[in-house]
Amino acid sequence: MNPNMPPRLCSQRGNALVEFALVLPLLLLIFAGIVDFGFLFQRYEVITNAAREGARIGVLPGYDEAAVQQRVLDYVQAGLSMSAGDAVAALTPPPDVDTVMLAAGTGAPFAATQVTVSFTYNYLIIGPIVNLVTGGDWTASITINSRSTMRREIVGS
């Protein structure tokens, strides 16, 4: 510090504010990323549970492919607050195909069918936050895929 400088120029007041102003955007971006990852994880859990719920319904007698798809879409709509047009659900194969004969523990044969429910969801990464700051139309997304397979067992078939 030069003793000939006026005290006003030698003051340290305001340094912390300037440093905070320089670091704040980075801290906000990190915080937004943490929040966005939380939303992504929540979406993944809903998609996974929806596929599992669809497979669970698919192995029950009396339910067809349309009922399974509707159950999955209802679960996703309730969990993600989205419209039916935003979701894509696929049931492969339908519950009444690909029958395989297995031996049950009692020795009686029974038919088993694999029911697989797949669900795909596109998640927009930090898009609303980036669009708010830039005023642009940024649309980077992650595709979340979930698949659940359960076995339908029909004793005595």
What is the predicted function of each stretch?
Residues 2-76:
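Alpha-helical assembly-interface signal, strongest on the long, hydrophobic N-terminal helix that forms
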Residues 2-3, 56-157:
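Short, conserved structural patches
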